[in-house]
Amino acid sequence: MTETIKVSESLELHAVAENHVKPLYQLICKNKTWLQQSLNWPQFVQSEEDTRKTVQGNVMLHQRGYAKMFMIFKEDELIGVISFNRIEPLNKTAEIGYWLDESHQGQGIISQALQALIHHYAQSGELRRFVIKCRVDNPQSNQVALRNGFILEGCLKQAEFLNDAYDDVNLYARIIDSQ
């Protein structure tokens, strides 16, 4: 059975699965132009098969506990993704990534999903340190981190190559002890 985290009456997180390939590919295509302003990977999504391979890899990583990828559903419609892009089990640390369909932004959906995800894994004792890295010139993502109790720990200079330039990246973290 697919892991599900209930966020609210209308929002749920579903662990990535094979049946998400087609709607995920369609959502990426719909949002590709603006996604490429902040993320490098959308340029490499050329077909549904590319998405299938990514999903299959993430299913395996999810099962092994080295990453967790969740689809964000609003009333049974796929509207975005939130994930632990990398998990360090020994350190109980997870690096978080997220993106949302452009038409659903500005409604607090990512914040709600983020809170539900980190609390679910903090309460289980699996994770305690949560990290968000975002480009300095991505104000929306920086605001998500700050609004959700993450503390700016520093700025990584020229840490991310995107659109023919090296960009500075802010590193935010939040620690939640389950005790």
From Swiss-Prot:
EC number: 2.3.1.-
Keyword set, alphabetical order: Acyltransferase, Cytoplasm, Transferase
Principal EC category: transferase
Claim: Lyase is one of the keywords in the record: no
Gene3D superfamilies given in the database record: 3.40.630.30
Domain N-acetyltransferase: 11-172
Location of this chain's protein in the cell: Cytoplasm
Catalytic activity: N-terminal L-seryl-[ribosomal protein bL12] + acetyl-CoA = N-terminal N(alpha)-acetyl-L-seryl-[ribosomal protein bL12] + CoA + H(+)
UniProt-listed CDD domains: NAT_SF
UniProt-listed InterPro entries: Acyl_CoA_acyltransferase, GNAT_dom, Ribosomal_N-acetyltransferase
Gene Ontology MF terms: N-acetyltransferase activity; protein N-terminal-serine acetyltransferase activity; protein-N-terminal amino-acid acetyltransferase activity; protein-N-terminal-alanine acetyltransferase activity
Phenotype upon loss of function: No longer acetylates bL12.
Gene Ontology CC terms: cytoplasm
Subcellular location, principal: cytoplasm
GO biological process annotation, one example: protein modification process
Pfam families reported for this sequence: Acetyltransf_3
Summary of the function given for this chain in its UniProt record: This enzyme acetylates the N-terminal serine of ribosomal protein bL12, converting it into the acetylated form of bL12 known as bL7.
PANTHER family named among the record's database cross-references: RIBOSOMAL-PROTEIN-SERINE ACETYLTRANSFERASE
Protein name: Ribosomal-protein-serine acetyltransferase
Gene assigned in the entry: rimL
